[in-house]
Swiss-Prot record:
Superkingdom of this protein's organism: Bacteria
Identification of the protein by name: 5-oxoprolinase subunit A
Organism: Bacillus cereus (strain B4264)
Keywords: ATP-binding, Hydrolase, Nucleotide-binding
Keyword Magnesium in annotation: no
The UniProt record lists the keyword ATP-binding: yes
Gene that encodes it: pxpA
Biological-process GO terms, alphabetical: carbohydrate metabolic process
EC number: 3.5.2.9
UniProt cross-references to Pfam families, sorted A to Z: LamB_YcsF
Reaction catalyzed: 5-oxo-L-proline + ATP + 2 H2O = L-glutamate + ADP + phosphate + H(+)
Family: Belongs to the LamB/PxpA family.
Catalytic EC class: hydrolase
Protein task: Catalyzes the cleavage of 5-oxoproline to form L-glutamate coupled to the hydrolysis of ATP to ADP and inorganic phosphate.
Amino acid sequence: MKTIDLNCDSGESFGAYKMGNDDEILPFVSSINVACGFHAGDPSVMRQTIEKAMQHNVAIGAHPGFPDLIGFGRRNMNVSASEVYDYVLYQIGALDGFVKVAGGKMHHVKPHGALYNMAATNPEIADAIAKAIYHINPSLLLYGLANSEAFIQAAVKYNITLVQEAFADRTYKQDGTLTSRTEENALIKNEEEAIKQVLQMVKEGYVSAVNGEKVAVQAQTICLHGDGEKALQFAKRIYRTFEHDGISICAPK
């Protein structure tokens, strides 16, 4: 039986501001990426998100981003590799403290937003992220963009496991990177299109780029953005489609 991980960005509410459908989505995913307070989230939200994830037996990962609450961590920042290392180490450590107090074990790290996209094409940024993971806990998995040489090389250098990620609700360019959110066609909002893209990636090993070109992709985990307009509908539909097609949903080991 084919196995795939279905992950979702979670814990992105902040104080009185609620974001995402965390509680509703949890039953349909196998792992979550918890915001650590830099781009979103706060200590109370972090704790509550972890506790709920453990109730659903969902794997917990840190979702470190740039210190940019106003921009939600989706704006590039001119930072050094050393600064990225510090940002990531700090955020992993913060979330890990909450996970341990709750009696759980952290599973992975997935960079957020602009940090993720920069790391996918910038070896120095990817190296800083992998180094932070290695220094705090080398058994943590690294979720990174499928086929990214920067992520692959960083994971090999520090002997950490890379889980190659693809996206259900984002479009792709012909070089295998994600279409920028500044472009009108960056997001997939149609449920049928999202399902078609996911099945192509999981079953056939490719994704159709915005120009129609087929791009090879070996997806080990599929991401849904928890703040997406139709995140809950997509999660339910993907979950049921996988069940129907005999595809097991399970967090990677």
